[in-house]
From Swiss-Prot:
Origin species: Dictyostelium discoideum (Social amoeba)
Residue ranges, compositional bias (Low complexity): 278-293, 400-410, 429-440
Ranges of biased composition (kind: Acidic residues): 325-345, 411-428
Signal peptide per UniProt: none
Sorted UniProt keywords: Repeat, WD repeat
Protein name: WD40 repeat-containing protein DDB_G0271002
WD repeats: 165-204, 210-249
Lineage per the UniProt record: Eukaryota, Amoebozoa, Evosea, Eumycetozoa, Dictyostelia
InterPro entries named in the record: GATA_zinc_finger (IPR053019), WD40/YVTN_repeat-like_dom_sf (IPR015943), WD40_repeat_CS (IPR019775), WD40_repeat_dom_sf (IPR036322), WD40_rpt (IPR001680)
Gene3D superfamilies in the cross-refs: YVTN repeat-like/Quinoprotein amine dehydrogenase
Region (Disordered): 278-301, 316-345, 389-440
Amino acid sequence: MNETNVNNNNQSNEEVEEINDEFKLYYDGLQESKHMKYYTNSFKSYENKQHKRVSSTLVPLKSEDLQSIRINTIHILAWKLNLMAVSYNSKFIFTAESDVINVRNIDNPNIIIKTFAMDTMEMTINQIRLGILDGEEVLVSVDEGGFVRIIFVNDFEREVIRLYNHGVSTWGIAICPSKPLIAVSSNSHKITIWNLDDENPQETKFLLPKHKHNIPSIDFSPCGNYLVSVSIDKNIRIWDVNKRQLLRIQTLAQWCWACRWIDLTTKEDQLYQYYNNSSNSRDNNNNNSNSNNNGGGGIIIDKSWRGLTQHEEQQLVENNQEVEPMPEEEEEEEEEEVNQVDNDDEIFQENDDNEENEENTEFLNEANDGVDDDDDLIIQNGVFTNEDDIIFDGGLPPINQHQQQQQQNQEIEEEGQEGQEEQEDGTENENNQGTIATTTTTTTTIINSIKKLEDAINQQRIENNRINSKVPLDKNKLPSNVVFSTYQNLYLSDVEMDLLLTMNNAIPTSFPIIQTQIDRIAFLEVVPELSLVIAASQGPARLISLYRIVKQIPLNNNINNNENNNNENNDNNLNEPETNMFLESVLSPPSGGPGLIVGLSVVKNYVKNNPLAFSINLYVMYINGIFINFHIKRSTIRNKPIHQNSTFFDPINKCNIFGLDITSFGV
């Protein structure tokens, strides 16, 4: 018995040394997947009938750390969402610190240029987001009290626009690039949309009230006609903003945290126009960079947008405090009738036993964020586990298979030890029999819980399919794809939400950690020009992964043609490009070990008449004040697999100009 314990201790020490070695390799900046103990794996939850095989044709990216500095004057709160943004001309850093927003010089971030006092009754800011609002660069903030603020980046002296979300803790922000629309999502389980072109946008706002839990992230499509939202209720929804109608819904097995549209268009004229518009806009911004000392130096657009006055906002706050809230069900029915939102989703009505969870509590309370209130949490190896793996037709993900095998091996070993103890001590034998009985009961409970959860999810999917089938979609009018995340996984989906590409354990790590609800992928950005998806974890992993999207004709496109000649649908499917996503690299953390990520911002760099030279600056801020600037670009433009049918094919360098869905061009 003692010898066995010694062997086990030696084995444990060896494992610790191995982990430490990998930990050292990791922090030495060796970010290749071979150094990762837990690495990302992709799963498809749909059946690929043609067994298509694809390969990457994208130029690898090159990442360089241009700047790494510690900001000593910063005071950012933990467990919020994104609290940092960088202006598009890379001149200013915006940091949300408690209830104020500080503007810092990017060359010396310790210098505060201006402070915006939000005048929000000291309500702490939950998130800020920078974007283009109907052609103008703005910064939007939301906070615990439902106060919404819009700052004009190109004119700091311009009056800040005030909007009010009725005292509800607000988290998600969506900025429409092509229309004057601002949307926010909150702990009221509703999405609020304002049209700033209206004379009184606060009165004409409308709601999308279908979610049944807090909504951390929303995003407008580039055209502004559609919106995607994700929620702690484990649902991702796609909305028609103009009709105020739910178009699609998909239910997952984990809390959802972030979402973005990514339009992998196959229309080259649209791509060319998009590039030219972006390039011209950047040129104009640069030409005006020295003309305005009070802001970001871009184009100042004179729009008659208005929000609330301070007096009007104060009156709304007082009225909101005086009026007793109506019951949740009556409130939703009234809002749905006023807003003419499609009410064909009775399966999402609130349950009485969930009423206690409808208070305006924070998303990100570290103390209560690790345990879900639903029945999908079971105990496995003494750890609460969310059984996400049942959504995959291919069985358990590898990590869960490994855990399951470890549990089985442990049970076998325990049974062998119990048999030995049986021969040595009769009293211990009785105890061991009790342990075996308890283990058997626990195993049965786990199996029953899994079956119960699987039945519930299957029933949910049936209802989702029923709802989805009632609203036909015109794919030509919709962006092609959405990217979204849960606390552990990353997803790429078509707009119909029936083809999910899942990256399990999407943030690799070189040291073993039990990934919990706290390890959430809360930061998500997309760069279509590089076919790039940037995902960052706010939890224990605290790392940033770079994913690439490729869409191309299968290599074995002609296989099984004879078998499918009598099936027109199969013939058509054989000619369709297939979309895939893969992990390309993981960015090195700052020296001294990573801290909690509190902000992530992307700035695009266009080069006139040379789209191959397109690059981005990825800015990352940690709670310990470390601020990093990564420069990411194509590693080379030569020796690249080519697709000569594309009008963007460059015969000199023998490569395609864009990484955006390049291999589907000309098909």
